[in-house]
Curated annotation (Swiss-Prot):
It is an enzyme of class 2 (transferase). The chain crosses the membrane at residues 48-68. Residues 308-353 are annotated as: Disordered. InterPro entries: ATL1/ATL16-like (IPR044600), Znf_RING (IPR001841), Znf_RING/FYVE/PHD (IPR013083). The lineage of its organism: Eukaryota, Viridiplantae, Streptophyta, Embryophyta, Tracheophyta. GO terms for biological process: protein ubiquitination. Residues 308-318, 340-353 have a biased composition (Basic and acidic residues). It is a single-pass membrane protein. Gene3D superfamilies: Zinc/RING finger domain, C3HC4 (zinc finger). The keyword Cytoplasm does not apply. This is E3 ubiquitin-protein ligase Os03g0188200. Keywords: Membrane, Metal-binding, Transferase, Transmembrane, Transmembrane helix, Ubl conjugation pathway, Zinc, Zinc-finger. It is found in: Membrane.
Length: 353
C-alpha cells in the first residue's frame, strides 16, 4: 500500500508539471494553431514521451506490488500453522514447560496405582507405622482409597492429589517429576538396604570418637580444659547431636508406601473387582461422591474422634462417672418400702463403684 501511494503521488506531480506548458501554449492565440497542427490533440512530442514513461512506470510498480503481495500471502499460511503448532505442541524444553503449566492428563492420573488402605496395611511390614495423606494430614482409614505416585511412592487421597495433578506434574511433597520414568524397584530396595548400613557405620564411628575423647580426660585436664577452652565442650556434645539427627532421619516415613510391583498390581485388581461388584447391584450410583462432600465428612469424623478422645481423657483424669448397675432394682413409686429399697440399691451401686 505504501508503494502504491508513493507511485500515485509521483504520477500526479509529473502530470501537473507536464500540463502547465500545454495550458500556457493554449493561452497564446498566436501559436495555438501551429501546435494543434504539429501534434494531434494539442500535445507536444515531449509531453507524449513523458506520459508514456509515467504510465509505464505506474504499471510496473503496480505489477511489482501485486507480485510482492502474492508472495507474502503464499508464505503466510506456513508461518501461521507453525506458530499454532508451536503454541499447542511445543518441542523440547518448551513442551516440558507447557506440560508443567497445564498438569497431567486425566488418563495418566487414573493410570497411577490405587488400592484400599485396609488391604495395603495387611501386606505392610509390622514395624512400619500408619500412613497418612500429606495434603490433608489425616491418617488413612481401612476403607479409604489411596493413590500411589510411581516416581516417589508417596501416597495421597485421590480427592486430595487429583486437583494438584491437574495443574502440576510434580509431587507436592518432594517435587519429583511424574513425567519421568519411575525408579526401578530393585534400585529403591538397594538404596533402602544400604541406608541402614551407612547409618550403623556412622554411629559406630561417632561412638569411637566419643570413647577416645572421654579416655583422654583426667581430673586435672578437665579443670584446665574447662578453664581455658570452654567452647570445646560443644564438640563433646556434637556426637550426641549427630546420633539424635540420625535417629530422627531413621524415623518411619508416614507418607511413603513401598511394596513390590506384583503386590500393587494384585491390590489394584482386587479394588477394581470390588468396585465392579458393588456397581453391578447399583447401576445408578456410578458417579463418584463430590469432593466437597468427602472433605466435609472427613472433617466431621475428625471432630468426632477428637471429642471422643477428650471425653476419654476426662474419664481417666480423676472424675468418676456413676454407671447404672445391671442388677439394681428399678424405681417404684409405691409406699415407703419402695423408697427403702431405692436407697439400698443406690448405696449398693455407689459401693460397687
Amino acid at each position: 500500500m505504501a508503494h502504491r501511494r508513493i507511485a500515485l503521488a509521483v504520477l500526479v506531480t509529473l502530470l501537473l508539471s507536464a500540463f502547465r506548458p500545454c495550458l500556457a501554449q493554449q493561452s497564446n492565440d498566436d501559436t495555438s494553431k501551429h501546435h494543434r497542427s504539429a501534434t494531434a490533440g494539442g500535445f507536444t512530442p515531449t509531453t507524449v514521451v513523458v506520459l508514456v514513461a509515467l504510465i509505464t512506470a505506474f504499471v510496473l510498480l503496480t505489477v511489482f506490488s501485486v507480485l510482492i503481495n502474492r508472495c507474502a500471502q503464499a508464505r503466510a499460511p506456513p508461518r501461521r500453522a507453525f506458530r499454532s503448532t508451536a503454541s499447542h505442541q511445543p518441542v523440547g524444553g518448551a513442551a516440558a514447560a507447557s506440560r508443567a503449566s497445564r498438569g497431567l492428563d486425566k488418563e495418566v492420573v487414573e493410570a497411577f496405582p490405587t488400592a484400599v488402605y485396609g488391604d495395603v496395611k495387611a501386606r505392610m511390614a509390622a514395624k512400619s507405622g500408619p500412613l497418612e495423606c500429606a495434603v490433608c494430614l489425616a491418617e488413612f482409614a481401612d476403607s479409604d482409597e489411596l493413590r500411589v505416585l510411581p516416581a516417589c511412592c508417596h501416597v495421597f487421597h485421590p480427592d486430595c492429589i487429583d486437583p494438584w495433578l491437574a495443574a502440576a506434574v510434580t509431587c507436592p511433597l518432594c517435587r519429583a517429576n511424574l513425567t519421568a520414568p519411575p525408579v526401578s524397584l530393585a534400585a529403591a530396595e538397594s538404596s533402602d538396604l544400604t541406608a541402614p548400613e551407612e547409618a550403623v557405620q556412622e554411629e559406630e564411628s561417632e561412638e569411637l570418637d566419643e570413647a577416645s575423647l572421654m579416655a583422654t580426660f583426667t581430673p586435672e585436664s578437665v579443670i584446665d580444659f574447662g578453664a581455658t577452652h570452654d567452647h570445646e565442650f560443644d564438640r563433646a556434645g556434637y556426637p550426641h547431636y549427630r546420633r539424635t539427627q540420625s535417629a530422627m532421619d531413621a524415623a518411619p516415613d508416614r507418607h511413603t508406601l513401598r511394596l513390590p510391583e506384583h503386590v500393587m498390581k494384585e491390590l489394584a485388581a482386587d479394588r477394581r473387582h470390588r468396585r465392579a461388584a458393588s456397581l453391578a447391584g447399583y447401576p445408578d450410583s456410578v458417579e463418584r461422591t463430590p469432593r466437597w462432600l468427602t472433605s466435609l465428612w472427613r472433617s466431621v469424623s475428625w471432630q468426632r474422634q477428637s471429642r471422643a478422645d477428650w471425653d476419654a481423657g476426662e474419664e481417666h483424669g480423676g472424675s468418676k462417672r456413676v454407671h447404672p448397675v445391671a442388677g439394681a432394682q428399678d424405681e417404684t413409686p409405691s409406699g415407703s418400702g419402695s423408697d427403702g429399697s431405692k436407697e439400698n440399691s443406690d448405696s449398693d451401686a455407689l459401693n460397687r463403684v
